[in-house]
Structures are given as C-alpha cells and as structure tokens.
Amino acid sequence: MTSWVLSQGWVLKTKHISQSGGLMSNDSLKLVGAIGTSISYQGAQDSISLKGGFFSSVSGIYKKPTKLLTEVNDTIKTTQDSVNVQAVAIDINGIRSATLNIQIGGARNILKLPMYSINDSTYQVSIPDTLLSVRNFRSWVVTVDSMYYEAISNYDTPVLEFSENELKMDDTLSRYPSGVISNRWRMVSWPAELLNGDLKNSNLKDGYVFYDWDMQTGEWTKPDTIIIGKAYWFKHNFDDNVIFTNNNSVGRAMPLMDYELTLKDTGWNIIGSPFSFPVTVEYDSLPVSLYTYGYNDSTETDGWTEPTSTLIPWSGYAVYAQHAGQKLTVKTFENDIIENNRSSSRVDPKEWTLNLRLKSENYLDYSTIIGRTNQGKDGKDLLDRPALPAIESYVAVRTEING
C-alpha cells in the first residue's frame, strides 16, 4: 500500500504500513507500522516524533558514541624536543574537531591544543618541551562529531624522566624554598624517584647527618638509600641553609594518578610526598591528619605543627596507622578531590574543632585538636591518637579521653 499524506506544507510518502493508528485530528498525524512503530506529528509544535521501527533504528545509529583511543609513550624524557600524541576517533557522523587537554601537576588551569587530522579518523598534535618538567602532566582528548556529540578519552599519565639538577628544593612549591636552616632537626623527603638514591654515611661532626627514626621503639638508624614516599630526619651545622637537588642522579616523576602509600608499622609512621607539588592524602575517602616538625622561618622554634591533610614537597610528616599495612591514597588533582568529597563538604552546625596551641621562646606544640564530629564516638575511636613522641627538649599539650 502506498499513501500520500499532506499537512501544513510537508509531504510524507510511506510504503507497506502494516496499520494506521488513531484518527487524524487537530492537524496531527500518527502512523503505526513496520517503518515507524510510532510516527507522530503535532501541528501545534511543527515537529515529528519517531518511536521505534526503522526510522528510530537509523536515528539510534547516528547517536552511537564515538570510539576514541589515544596513544602516548609510557615514558617521556624532559630532554625531548616535543611529545607526539595521537588519537583515533571512529564516528559514523564524522569528527568536527579534536582537542588535546593538558594539566600540569599542581595546576588548576587546563591547556588546550587543537589536533590536526592525518586521515578521516586519526588526529595528532605535539606537546612542546616547555611543558615537560619534574611536575609531569596528564592529558586527555575531547572530540566533537558533526551532530555535536562530545567524546572524552581516558587520562594518559606517563612517567617523566628528568636529568641531574632538575629537581631542586628551592622551588616555590617547596616546604623549604630557602633551604633547611642550620642546627635544627627537620624532616625532609625527595618528591620523585631517584635512580641512584644512595646516601653517603653522614655524621654531624662532618657537617650534617641523616637519620631514620623508628617512632615506636625510639631507635635511630642511619639510612643508606633514599626511598620515594619516605622521609628522614636531617640536621646540619653549616653557616648557610642547605638546598637539596638531584646533582648525582637522574630521576623519575611519578604518573599523575592516585598513588598508594603503605604505612609499615602500627602507630606513628614517617612519610614524604612522591610528587613535586602539594597533594592531598585520604584514608577511606576521609582526610588524614599529618604532622610535620618545626617551621623553617627566622623564629627557629621546634615542635609539632598543626595537623594538615596536604603533603608539601620536600617535607616529612608523621601519620598514625591503626594497623600495619594501612594504605593511604594520595590525590594528585584538586578537582578529583572535590568530586570525591562533594557529599562530605557540607558543614554540620553541630560539628566543631578547636586547635590547642602552646608556645615558648624556643618550642611549640600545635598538634592537639579537640572537638565534635559525626564520625566520632563516645570514648576511644579511630579519631583518637596517642601523643606524638618528643625530640630532645620540648613543650606539649596533653589530653585524656574521659579525663
């Protein structure tokens, strides 16, 4: 059967309609059958609605998402002139544009580089060497097809190898931008993996010393290797501040993805940041309390600082583990942290905290927090921690549960 339907200036020719459904009234049309299980037209809206059947099937094909794959080398060197990024985008509608998005470690802004087409489905662009540094980067591709549907690739997170003297403590994002002051114990760490992390035997009589302190037993040992994610106690008696750099070893900047830090011991552990920009630490999607020792300013006061959940490059931190092998998650980008913690960002008016601070001429203790939280319980719970151990002379704030 062939029929012609005329209505307000448009023509629809159909064949083999298995049945018609409903009466035509008020300038409306509804056809039910093999071609369009439901084809309806409402004169008031000047539109056609397709529901199932052949027309709907064809329409569904054009709405299928783009198949998008990207290709970047797993390991990149800062000495390269550029880094080639390639994307293969397969879409029945054709691709209107492809853009490479780049985010440098520690940066909020996203750089966008238009990609050029090699053929109908392959796109390419080069990342300039000016973006290759110890902070590393992550990248992803966004394509738009001819129907303006958008597709987003997975993140590419390469390892970045850097040369000697590229990793420096006197960086603006460092805990010690002016170096470590003299005659004070401070915790230091290296925010990258050194391929040769050997430490020479040190002695304070010779000018400086490194120690690994077991905070459970109180035992002090001299380390012989720098390990990423671990911090060390350091003291020197030179006239000038000490600034560390990787002058004897090339290194690797870790991929910019969630990084796991394993706490070896039950109780207090010493950790450092594996990244050369500030990062946030979580445990079970909740912020972790980290404590560093002393401030690196002219006051030269010693003691435990206020708790934080942010790891700053080159510093070391004490963190408490409820059990050996507990794993912390290091989040490399703030936007990821915001997404993960969106539900926990609401402030409950019944919750409160108070930081108790004690300071003398040469010593301080800012480590104690009291308060009320929905995650807390009456009596001892996971939020309660024993006092941090003391080093040499000190002042301290002490509290007791139910005391």
Model features per residue range: what roles?
Residues S59-R175:
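Glycan-association/targeting regions that enable binding to alpha-glucans and other polysaccharides
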Residues Q8-G60, F162-G403:
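N-terminal exported-region signature
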